[in-house]
């Protein structure tokens, strides 16, 4: 059983303490009602991992943990087998005591694009919405954040996060809660809020932006990364049944339209800091994610389009401030 008690104890002593009015009951309800058919298998994999304190831990340039003396072949194989029980691994990569988890996404590339444009994360309390396996939270900690809290309702991601945390010496500077943004009260408590790869999955994107704003302190910073298309401030793509084989894609605005959405929600100092086409080097099938990936979702005769005929995935990073 994954224990959230450490997180409750942590926030009881800081400015997130008012969250304890609702959070424990929500988690207790989740524990009663959840259980994906494979959840027991996943949580067992976490439980059976060895407890290791890293001799060398690098979260600034990567997510890498090393022991003082190399682990035995048997120990490495045990870790690898248990981590493979948590496949597919989508966000990473991770290098843990000789086990290199080559994930579907090179999330480090995204972090390298985002990091230069952020306000200094030193000492900050951060919320990462739709955090996946938690890769970027560890990089936030590496960049100096005091506390990174991730929310993602996907149970596999929770187990992947807890597995990595255990191999990082049970590091308590990052925590993942199996909740969606709509389940959070208006905490107004985070210095920086990240929403990366979430907005296009929301039926009401402006409501999502308001929800993000409700989590920020005054003068807090929003980091928004999402799919965009080319066009002016009035351009928005509303895909049909699927976009790049994904059913749950609702609105893909231009970067200029997205700036207007943020302005409408009351954000200021809005900047588009990066726009890039997603490549099949950044998102691809690997030994740790063996099903279809980006190359399968693009037109084989024209990779500038998806198999449905829409523009191929292009992503923008916008940064804005809550006044």
Swiss-Prot record:
It comes from the Bacteria. InterPro entries: CmoB (IPR010017), Mo5U34_MeTrfas-like (IPR027555), SAM-dependent_MTases_sf (IPR029063). Keywords: Transferase, tRNA processing. It catalyses: carboxy-S-adenosyl-L-methionine + 5-hydroxyuridine(34) in tRNA = 5-carboxymethoxyuridine(34) in tRNA + S-adenosyl-L-homocysteine + H(+). GO terms for molecular function: transferase activity, transferring alkyl or aryl (other than methyl) groups. It holds the Pfam family Methyltransf_9. Its EC number is 2.5.1.-. GO terms for biological process: tRNA wobble uridine modification. Gene3D superfamilies: Vaccinia Virus protein VP39. The keyword Transferase applies. Carboxy-S-adenosyl-L-methionine binds at residues 91, 105, 110, 130, 152-154, 181-182, 196, 200, 315. Belongs to the class I-like SAM-binding methyltransferase superfamily. CmoB family. Homotetramer. Catalyzes carboxymethyl transfer from carboxy-S-adenosyl-L-methionine (Cx-SAM) to 5-hydroxyuridine (ho5U) to form 5-carboxymethoxyuridine (cmo5U) at position 34 in tRNAs. This is tRNA U34 carboxymethyltransferase. It comes from Shigella boydii serotype 18 (strain CDC 3083-94 / BS512). The gene is cmoB.
